[in-house]
């Protein structure tokens, strides 16, 4: 009877979490005003955090599961990258509990993702796969590379709702600042992932069907972390658009959950750490000088 009661409570909580994301809204800068892509309520993170994240007895093998170092893609190249601005050790960031693989919280997260997988439309899947390719590659620094300009254009995708003036060709100072900031955030993202070595959701729950396995650990989400960092920078340049920009970053985060490649807790940690990361940047004198130059550029280029 006790087990049945627990299952019922888990079912009800899972249902509440699913209902919290079954809203439809217009995304910031969503091309063609497409309103058919569900947007999440951030309250589903709060609900999941209420669930016990500690390991359950008798699951030592499951809890020992880590992302294998041998499966890391390009790790040697990643480790060679040095930061432009960021200097804080990752231990300076807020402690965030990574739920154990066997925990009730991880089970609730996996159930949530299975329900997303069951209910996602072909249109939503196509949208997720599209924006999965919109990221900045810090190793693509050769201007003769055919994808060099596209790589830098990707830095501007999150803020596309600011208007047509917000573009690489129009904002060289902004392009340089964002490329350096996201470069730094990628360096930190790798360090976080190596430290926690969290296995991907599909490694714990084989019913999650993915397009292809990814070459690094789950925690935190790189797409989410970089998007929230980008949003935090832009929100300091356009504070009146902060809510829109954070919603745009949330699109990236939720798309990773919808694809089954990241836990919600990966996304939430990314949001928290991104805010701290940007706060730390403002302690760097060179960053502040470069940021002030970008503010002047915006004052000249942004329509009044």
Can you annotate each of these PLM segments?
Residues 3-13:
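Bacterial N-terminal signal peptides that target proteins for export
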Residues 294:
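Extracytoplasmic/periplasmic copper-protein system
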Residues 275-277:
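Catalytic phosphate/nucleotide-handling subdomain of diverse soluble enzymes
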Residues 31-259, 280-286, 290, 299-302:
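Hydrophobic alpha-helical bundle signature of multipass membrane enzymes
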Residues 14-23:
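Bacterial N-terminal signal peptides
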Residues 25-29:
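Boundary at the C-terminal end of the N-terminal hydrophobic targeting segment
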Residues 223, 262, 270:
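Histidine-centered divalent metal-coordination motifs
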């Amino acid at each position: 009877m006790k087990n049945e009661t627990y299952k019922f409570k888990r079912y009800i909580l899972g249902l509440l979490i699913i209902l919290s994301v079954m809203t439809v809204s217009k995304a910031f800068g969503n091309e063609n005003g497409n309103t058919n892509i569900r947007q999440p309520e951030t309250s589903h993170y709060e609900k999941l955090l209420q669930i016990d994240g500690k390991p359950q007895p008798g699951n030592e093998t499951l809890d020992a599961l880590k992302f294998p170092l041998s499966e890391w893609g390009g790790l040697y190249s990643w480790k060679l990258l040095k930061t432009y601005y960021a200097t804080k050790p990752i231990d300076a960031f807020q402690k965030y509990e990574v739920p154990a693989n066997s925990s009730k919280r991880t089970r609730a997260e996996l159930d949530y993702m299975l329900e997303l997988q069951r209910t996602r439309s072909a249109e939503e899947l196509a949208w997720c796969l599209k924006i999965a390719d919109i990221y900045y590659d810090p190793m693509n620094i050769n201007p003769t590379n055919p994808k060099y300009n596209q790589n830098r254009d990707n830095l501007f995708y999150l803020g596309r709702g600011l208007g047509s003036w917000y573009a690489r060709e129009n904002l060289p100072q902004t392009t340089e600042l964002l490329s350096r900031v996201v470069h730094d955030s990628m360096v930190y993202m790798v360090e976080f992932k190596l430290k926690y070595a969290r296995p991907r959701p599909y490694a714990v729950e084989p019913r999650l069907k993915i397009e292809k396995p990814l070459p690094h650990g789950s925690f935190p989400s790189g797409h989410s972390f970089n998007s929230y960092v980008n949003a935090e920078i832009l929100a300091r340049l356009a504070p009146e658009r902060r809510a829109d920009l954070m919603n745009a970053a949330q699109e990236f985060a939720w798309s990773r959950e919808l694809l089954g490649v990241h836990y919600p807790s990966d996304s939430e940690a990314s949001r928290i750490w991104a805010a701290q990361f940007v706060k730390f940047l403002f302690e760097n004198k060179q960053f502040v000088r470069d940021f002030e130059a970008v503010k002047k550029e915006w004052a000249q280029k942004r329509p009044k």
